[in-house]
C-alpha cells in the first residue's frame, strides 16, 4: 500500500521496533517526527540522517510543548518499564501518558497504540483471539508489564471515544529482525553458553513477526483505526517454538543451545489468531528461517557458518 506525504508522529523511535518503523516511514516520503528521551546520541544521529525530526518529550508530565498538534497519524510504540514493581510509575508513564498524548493529538486521522499479547491470560497451546480472556501473563518475568498494558488499553479505549479519535490497538507478539529481538538475545545466550530457560509446558510456541512485516502492515492498520477503538492481534503467519528457532540459530552459527525447563520464571506459550489481522493487512510474507538468517547477517555476519 502506497503511504506517503503524511505527517506522522512515532513514539519510541530508539526502541527495537520504533527505530526501524520511523526510518522506514521517512524513506517513504513522509514527514516523520520521533519522540523519545534520546539517551543514546548515536541512535538519534542515525534517525536524523534518515530524515526523522527528533524531539524530546515527557509523557509522564504531559509536556508536549515541543510537539505540534497537526499530525495526520500517530504510531505510538514507546513504552516505559520501571525497575522492580513500581506500578504507580508505570501507570503514570504508560497509561496516563498515552491518554495525555491522545488528547494532544486528537486531530489525527488515525492513532495506532501498540500493546502486547502479554495482556492475555496464559492458555497453553491454544490460539488467542482478540476476545480471549485477559490476565497477568508476564508477571513471572516483568512484574508490572501485563497489568500496565491492560490499564493502558483501557485509557486508549476511553480516549478514542472522548476525543473522537480513530484508534487501533495492536497486540504485538514477538517482533524480530535485523535490529534484533528476543531470538537475537537467545543467540547471544547461546554464544556465551548461557542456558535458555523455558516453561515446562513445552514446546514454547510464539507468533513471530518480522520487522519488514511490521512496517508493511502499518498503513493498513492505520486505515483500520475506528471509534470505538479497533483491537487486533499483531503477529506473523508462522507460529514457531523457541526450541525450533534456537536450534536453527545453532545450525546457522555452529552453536548448540542449552535448554533448561523450569516453572520459576519463563513465560508460557503465546500463540495468536491472526485471522482479523490478515483481513486488514493481507498476508504477511517473511519466512521465519529467512528472517533469522538475515538477522544474523545484519548483526554478526562473521557468525554464519
Language-model features: locations:
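Active-site helix of classical SDR
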Residues: 148
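NAD(P)H-binding glycine-rich loop region in Rossmannoid oxidoreductase-like domains
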Residues: 41, 52-93
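N-terminal Rossmann NAD(P)H-binding glycine-rich loop of SDR-like oxidoreductase domains
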Residues: 8-27
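Mid/C-terminal beta-alpha module of Rossmann-like enzyme folds, strongest
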Residues: 192, 217-220, 224-265, 273-274, ...
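Amphipathic terminal alpha-helices
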Residues: 288-305
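Substrate-binding strand-loop-helix patch
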Residues: 176-180, 203-215, 231-249, 268-270, ...
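Conserved Rossmann-fold NAD(P)-dependent oxidoreductase catalytic core, especially the SDR/UDP-sugar
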Residues: 99-144
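NAD(P)-dependent short-chain dehydrogenase/reductase
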Residues: 154-206, 211-213, 249
Amino acid at each position: 500500500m502506497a503511504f506517503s506525504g503524511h505527517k506522522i508522529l512515532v513514539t519510541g523511535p530508539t526502541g527495537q521496533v520504533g527505530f526501524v518503523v520511523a526510518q522506514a516511514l521517512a524513506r517513504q516520503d513522509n514527514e516523520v517526527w520521533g519522540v523519545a528521551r534520546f539517551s543514546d546520541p548515536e541512535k538519534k544521529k542515525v534517525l536524523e540522517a534518515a530524515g526523522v525530526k527528533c524531539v524530546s518529550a515527557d509523557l509522564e508530565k504531559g509536556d508536549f510543548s515541543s510537539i505540534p498538534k497537526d499530525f495526520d497519524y500517530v504510531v505510538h510504540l514507546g513504552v516505559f518499564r520501571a525497575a522492580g514493581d513500581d506500578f504507580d510509575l508505570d501507570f503514570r508513564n504508560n497509561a496516563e501518558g498515552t491518554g495525555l498524548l491522545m488528547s494532544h493529538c486528537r486531530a489525527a486521522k488515525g492513532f495506532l497504540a501498540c500493546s502486547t499479547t502479554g495482556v492475555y491470560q496464559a492458555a497453553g497451546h491454544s490460539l488467542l483471539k482478540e476476545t480471549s480472556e485477559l490476565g497477568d501473563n508476564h508477571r513471572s518475568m516483568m512484574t508490572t508489564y501485563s497489568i500496565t498494558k491492560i490499564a493502558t488499553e483501557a485509557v486508549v479505549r476511553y480516549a478514542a471515544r472522548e476525543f473522537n479519535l480513530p484508534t487501533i490497538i495492536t497486540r504485538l507478539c514477538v517482533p524480530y529482525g535485523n535490529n534484533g529481538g528476543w531470538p537475537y538475545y537467545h543467540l547471544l545466550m547461546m554464544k556465551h553458553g548461557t542456558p535458555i530457560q523455558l516453561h515446562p509446558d513445552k514446546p514454547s510456541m510464539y507468533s513471530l513477526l518480522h520487522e519488514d512485516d511490521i512496517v508493511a502492515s502499518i498503513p493498513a492498520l492505520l486505515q483500520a483505526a475506528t471509534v470505538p477503538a479497533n483491537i487486533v492481534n499483531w503477529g506473523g503467519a508462522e507460529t514457531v517454538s523457541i526450541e525450533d528457532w534456537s536450534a536453527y540459530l545453532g545450525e546457522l552459527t555452529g552453536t548448540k543451545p542449552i535448554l533448561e525447563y523450569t516453572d520459576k520464571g519463563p513465560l508460557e506459550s503465546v500463540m495468536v489468531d491472526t485471522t482479523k489481522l490478515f483481513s486488514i493487512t493481507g498476508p504477511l510474507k517473511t519466512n521465519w528461517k529467512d528472517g533469522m538468517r538475515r538477522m544474523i547477517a545484519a548483526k554478526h555476519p562473521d557468525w554464519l557458518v
